[in-house]
Structure formats: C-alpha cells, structure tokens
Amino acid sequence: MAPRTSLALFVSLNLLFFTCTSATTGTCPIQISTCANVLNLVDLTLGNPPVKPCCSLIQGLADLEAAACLCTALKASILGIVNINLPINLSVLLNVCSRNAPKGFQCA
C-alpha cells in the first residue's frame, strides 16, 4: 500500500507544480510606430537608421509571430503612412532585425 500512496503523492505534487507554471508567449506591441525610422519614412536621415527600438519590440517573438505582427501593423497603417509597399517594407524590417519571414509567408 505504501508504493501506491507514494505514487499518488508524487503525481499530485507534479500536477500541482506543473499547473502553476505558464508558458511564455510573445505579444504584438502597439508601439510599432518606432519602426518607421527604420524605413526612413518619418525621419529622413543619412546613414544607418536607429534599429534598436524597433527590433527590441519584436525580440520575444518567433519569426512567424514577428512577421505577422509587423504585417498587421503595416496594413493597419499604425505607422501613419499612406503609400507603402507591404512586401518590401516587411522584408526590410525583418532583415534589419536579423529575422526571416517564414517560407511562403505573404503580407497582402
């Protein structure tokens, strides 16, 4: 009877501890407008645009999540830009942040 009690206690403690943990998931930030400087669409500067603020916004996201987040932001015109080329701008933002769009991903 002791092994059953020990097993039941072990399983109960495992269930208790594993239900208390949570998975980390990234979220698409609203402050994506900081990426406008990367595209040189808001602040036209010579040289390299500041990429750190933009890339830090999508840092915790997987490549697919980052691409979807930036695509959604570009389509929603959060950047406040009327004429944008979605595939090119998305590619520029992902490349600057050392990210890749998943194969077959289309921002349309």
UniProtKB/Swiss-Prot annotation:
Q: Which SMART domains match?
A: AAI
**Range of residues in the leader sequence:** 1-23
A Pfam entry, by short name: Hydrophob_seed
Where is the protein situated, by its record's location annotation? Secreted
- Tell whether Secreted is among the UniProt keywords: yes
Q: Which SUPFAM superfamilies match?
A: Bifunctional inhibitor/lipid-transfer protein/seed storage 2S albumin (SSF47699)
Q: Which UniProt keywords apply?
A: Disulfide bond, Secreted, Signal
The cross-references to InterPro entries, in alphabetical order and at most eight, read:
Bifun_inhib/LTP/seed_sf, Bifunc_inhib/LTP/seed_store, Hydrophob_seed_dom, Plant_LTP/defense-related
The UniProt entry's sequence similarity note says: Belongs to the plant LTP family. PEARLI1 subfamily.
Gene Ontology CC: extracellular region
Q: Which cysteines link up through disulfide bonds?
A: C28-C55, C35-C54, C71-C107
Q: Which CDD domains match?
A: HPS_like
The gene it comes from is AIR1B
The source's superkingdom equals Eukaryota
What is the recorded name of this protein?
Answer: Putative lipid-binding protein AIR1B
